[in-house]
Swiss-Prot record:
InterPro entries: Glutathione_peroxidase, GPX_CS. This is Glutathione peroxidase homolog. Coiled coil: none annotated. Its EC number is 1.11.1.9. One of its GO terms (biological process) is response to oxidative stress. One of its GO terms (molecular function) is glutathione peroxidase activity. Induction: By water stress.
Length: 17
């Protein structure tokens, strides 16, 4: 999900946020 930046999926450490 790092490519999509989905913080709502419990992935706040993605590229977008």
């Amino acid at each position: 999900y790092k490519d999509q930046g989905l913080e709502i999926l419990a992935f706040p450490c993605n590229q977008f946020g």
